[in-house]
Amino acid sequence: MSNGFIVQIIGAVVDIEFPQDAVPQVYDAVKVVSEGQGQGLVLEVQQQIGGGVVRCITMGSSDGLRRGLEVMNSGKSIQVPVGVSTLGRIMNVLGEPIDEKGPIGEEERWSIHRAAPSYEDQSNSNDLLETGIKVIDLVCPFAKGGKVGLFGGAGVGKTVNMMELIRNIAIEHSGYSVFAGVGERTREGNDFYHEMMESNVLDKVSLVYGQMNEPPGNRLRVALTGLTMAEKFRDEGRDVLFFVDNIYRYTLAGTEVSALLGRMPSAVGYQPTLAEEMGVLQERITSTRTGSITSVQAVYVPADDLTDPSPATTFAHLDATVVLSRQIAALGIYPAVDPLDSTSRQLDPLVVGKEHYETARGVQTVLQRYKELKDIIAILGMDELSEEDKLTVARARKIERFLSQPFFVAEVFTGSPGKYVPLKETIRGFQGILKGEYDDLPEQAFYMVGSIDEVVEKSKKL
């Protein structure tokens, strides 16, 4: 392979000139070989712009780069370690260990750019994945091998919800998981690592981090690195869980480099290739006949606007959407899941059964009626309502509070022990409220408890 030389540097985007007969292909990895600062830096080819020049994105800081530095073409795309040796380790976008525990010791490396499984190879299942979180299991149940989005603005609990899901599923489900931290806070990555360690599930999780302080190249590719590791577990015939926090930062990293790559911005300043970039990632997150990938993705919603192009593009790919609401968080109800806005393809009587379906729809009907009555209550007060509506409001307020739940990962700051509620218990509790079996209990008893039996116990102490 002939070497090339850097001819232009604009932030994270670098132009490199190669001999005309040895131009690297798009997505090839190239490496700075000149001695000094910047040596060993890996770049990924994005465009061939003619005259032997290729435009690349750096997979690290471009500090210390200068024109004229020599660059070697590896002749292949970025390769990362896969397999059981990655479990319990923290790696960066290139699959290099960053946890100071020595080399990964992998037997195999895979390219991060891979084709999605063909239509014939794909399979879907209607098995439910129990999470132990009441509101999710009831209103927007997850499918095994499905895709779930956690939508929410800043500070409504996406990461805490995700950590609780990982903890519950890792302990109860005991499969392998891959966690990709895409452009999130390093502190959260650190908290997560220690949380997994304390729960004794670290040896079942591979962690890949490209956090907020990293250049856009890392944040753009780290989701693919994590996905490649998950695909390896799937192709070995396992059921693997793939967590991404946060998919919005993946889009944002693409936006940051898009203009530097010479593309015209589209709606709201996003890259024109937004739908394609999202599709390339999401189409690979799928289940095949050999194994399944169940993915949970946190999606930041800019300014709480669900019609923003980034969350709107993500919606199309998901089987279940868990929408976190600032209004519900303001009431002090956590998890702040909006039961009227959250959806799931699994909420179908043919999949979840008639009992579950009718309970979930009954809960939504009562909450929707309460929402409609709120304006009347605000203007005229409760006394103007009919007896039937008064009963609906009382039950709705109990349901709202019963949808809250203490989390294991939040024990430190709530002071109450976490609760895992089996689906049967969840359905039994909400059915009881809808039938009026608990009309005599005060609504405070329903707040921050697990099963309905705890409500009865709590009401005796009030």
Swiss-Prot record:
Gene Ontology terms: cellular component: plasma membrane; proton-transporting ATP synthase complex
Annotated catalysed reactions: ATP + H2O + 4 H(+)(in) = ADP + phosphate + 5 H(+)(out)
Source organism (scientific name): Aeromonas salmonicida (strain A449)
Pfam families the UniProt entry points to: ATP-synt_ab (PF00006), ATP-synt_ab_N (PF02874), ATP-synt_VA_C (PF22919)
CDD domains, per database record: ATP-synt_F1_beta_C (cd18110), ATP-synt_F1_beta_N (cd18115), F1-ATPase_beta_CD (cd01133)
Primary localization: membrane
EC annotation from Swiss-Prot or TrEMBL: 7.1.2.2
Membrane topology summary: Peripheral membrane protein
Keyword Nucleotide-binding set for record: yes
Protein name: ATP synthase subunit beta
